[in-house]
């Protein structure tokens, strides 16, 4: 079986990583955290400031409490909101155990809670209880930069890494 047109995502913040993935056969890469704090990003200033203060170790994987309620693993900065999400999962699992709600309703409650938490952080600037989804490259971010400058820097680093190999 041959997989073509594969894109790599997660933890990419430098051009050297891009070069490495391209050499391994990736068709491209996807960066999220790096662009979340670009000058052109609509993210709330407090959301961006939380990223600038963070280290790579602050981005922790989400926890799935109950196998009946799948949670897509994502990294986010640990805060009160991530603790509340874990508590919400326990609460919903309990209502399932008591047969107070159906499975599809339980899953919807989890999805709506987390989607609402992301909006609270990114749009409203609630960095205490909102979801601060961030990859491990968050530790590299120290200030806002224009998208063009970010891309230029990444491409320059990639090209330099490829010519040195």
What are these regions (language model features)?
Residues 1-3:
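Short, small-residue-biased leader/transition segments that mark boundaries at the very start
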Residues 7, 13-165:
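Conserved active-site-proximal phosphate/metal-binding subdomains
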